[in-house]
Amino acid sequence: MDIQRINTYNDNQFSKAVLLQHGCFLVDGKPYEVEIISDYEAIIRGENQAVYAAVIGEFRFYTPHITQFYDKDGKKVMEYPRLSLLTLRLEQIQPSQFYVDEDKINAISAFIHKPQDIIIQVFPDKERYISLDGHTRLYYAFLKGWDCVRAIVETSDDWIYKIVDEAQKRGIYTPKEMTLVSHDEYEIKWNRFCDDFFACDGVE
């Protein structure tokens, strides 16, 4: 089974709203959607329910706080234990990324309307938390003047500390210090850093 996550915002096979949430997948070339409808719930759509578990597993790699899944008729498909959510101030969060893609900012503005809509993954570090994902959301919170976001605690490998060191060398200690760039510039700068970093560090 070949599962591909769709990372573009324009694809006629999918709902625009779900594309903006990054909840679209191709499974052996067939379209499947996972649409977030609450803090912990989502609807999964696609022709073959036999592959739903695999799609949900892929989806939850990025969004583990979503724990209940329903089909298009409202029947529960899968359920996981609910995760505890923290409320963190932006100043408590150390980014592990340097750049923010302005196209992604525009995309999330379609479905993030209040601070409570932002849920990220973090890793505890001394008195603070390292953000493992959700950097676009964090920067959007800064742009909107919001003080707090919500988070779930996850684990991470030691390489995250090396990326944090690189961020701090660039003066990035909180979300507001990341740099907003065009999509093309983001692809070049951030992807090049990641390629070089993981090649040198031997991380796969």
Language-model features: locations:
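Basic- and aromatic-enriched surface patches that contact anionic nucleotides/nucleic acids
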Residues: D2, N10-V18, H22-G23, K126-E204
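Short alpha-helix boundary/capping and kink motifs at helix termini
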Residues: Q4-I36, Y40-N48, Y52-L132, T136, ...
